[in-house]
Every structure is written in C-alpha cells, then in structure tokens.
C-alpha cells in the first residue's frame, strides 16, 4: 500500500486519547490500514506503531517481535495487531532504554511493568488475551500509551525532564 509520514512529537494527535473502534465499521478499511502501518513501520525500522503515529484516530497498534532465525537467513518477525487494547494486569518492574519513531534520535531510560495481560481484538475481530513479558510487554505498553495520548517520555524520571526537553529542542530541528 503506502509508507505514511510519521507524526512527530508536538503534533496534537499524539496527545489524543483514542476511543475504541467498532470493528464492523472499521472492517472494510482494516486491511488497507494494517498494510500502511506494516509498510511504514518496516520502512522506518520500528518495533511498533500506533495508528495515531500515522495520523489516524483508530485505536489500533502493531508490534513486531524478532523471531529466532537460522544463521544466514533474513530476520523474521512475529506481528501482533491489537485493536482496542486494554491492559488489565501488570506485574513487576523493569527499567530499560526506549526510543520512538515520533521522537527520532531520543533514547531515555523508562520504567515499565515486567509482565502484563492485555485484552483486545485481533485483526479478525476476535477477542484475545495476550500474556506478555520482556520486550513484548514493553512494546505493548509503549504503543498502548500512544493510543491513550501518552508518550514514553511522560514516564521518565522527573529529574531528567529538563535535559530531555533540551535534547528534544535540538533534535526537532532535524525532523522533517
């Protein structure tokens, strides 16, 4: 389909809390939306993408988890599509560095739940429960935050906020 422009930090749509979508209403255009999200995420080498990062107001996110690939073969990914996702359970705590396609060049240590349970619809409109830990848990939390109008830097240590703001000002000069 199409590689879309990535919405950047400071654009209003990134701060909108997206409402759940009606799957039956969405279904006729879902394949095209998912293909655009897939193509865009792969083009920018992202691990995940929310619909509002390409300017859409649908409560949809997509995540790519690297699979074990035999040596010499191209990297393969397991794709997760979550529609109307809600985190229903969180356990543990882990700190790791995060970045975002909407804030290119910025990496910040962020604290997240170590494992989560998410209720959502899959791309066929069926209800699913995802039990996630590790990178998948982190990526789901990051993308669901986007759908809730939050950005990963909202979770940063408050002492780092002035430094993050300064770095964002510098980086944003290079964003197109």
Swiss-Prot record:
Disulfide bonds: none
InterPro entries for the chain: Peptide_deformylase, Peptide_deformylase_sf
Entry's family note: Belongs to the polypeptide deformylase family.
Function: Removes the formyl group from the N-terminal Met of newly synthesized proteins. Requires at least a dipeptide for an efficient rate of reaction. N-terminal L-methionine is a prerequisite for activity but the enzyme has broad specificity at other positions.
Cofactor section: Fe(2+)
Protease listed as a keyword: no
Name of protein: Peptide deformylase
Binding site for Fe cation: 100, 142, 146
Catalysed transformations (reactions): N-terminal N-formyl-L-methionyl-[peptide] + H2O = N-terminal L-methionyl-[peptide] + formate
UniProt GO BP: co-translational protein modification; translation
HAMAP family assigned: Pep_deformylase
UniProt-listed PANTHER family: PEPTIDE DEFORMYLASE (PTHR10458:SF22)
EC number per UniProt: 3.5.1.88
Catalytic site: 143
Organism expressing this protein natively: Elusimicrobium minutum (strain Pei191)
